[in-house]
Amino acid sequence: MERPDFFEFKNGEKAKLPFSSEEYNKRVNKLRSVMDTNNLDMVILTSMHNIAYYTGFIYCSFGRPYGCVVTKDKIVTISANIDASQPWRRSHCNNVIYTDWKRDNFLRAIVSIIGRDDPPKTIGIENDHVTLDIKEKLNSIFSIAIFKDISKHLMKQRMIKSDEEISIIKNGARIADLGAEEIVKHIKPGQSELEIAIAGRDKMEREIAKSYPDAEYMDTW
């Protein structure tokens, strides 16, 4: 029986993401500008927020590492086998799935994306997120590489909002107002805080689903 360290699985169709392909491409191009400025051959993203920002995929770790490799001509998410092809469907880029048959298959998947012929000499990582364990192993694998922290560069990029982001922020504020109004309606003597919170949350969740029918919601997958 073959037990692969990693593989690709493109099942289903690409899903509609929160932002357009043009928006994600602009973000990745800006990231590559940061790479050029800082002489980076590769970036390894590990945080949920940055992977979501540049690819559209939001992971749920449950103790497993997730990542995204960005080079001058590639962008690939790396996900655990438990998610199957969901990360591919819910991102605008390619995806590699690593298995649990061997320890550190996550790292083998990274190497598979960039190959062994021309190892990167400078690698950008998120020092405010990457674990000590992963960082030590990256140092061991890419022994000749210099690692640079790019977390602040990424944060500055995220701070400047596009028109598409502003639209979602405004809609989010509108939906939050609806939730607050529903909470006020349910505040009565003897009513539990839990039931009041449920009323506000349910109102917002239903409005979010109505406003974004193509999105994927908690406990629905």
What are these model-predicted stretches?
Residues 19, 34-51, 130, 177-221:
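Active-site cores enriched in adjacent His and Asp/Glu residues with nearby glycine-rich loops
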Residues 1-179:
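A composition/biophysics-driven feature that prefers long, compositionally simple stretches
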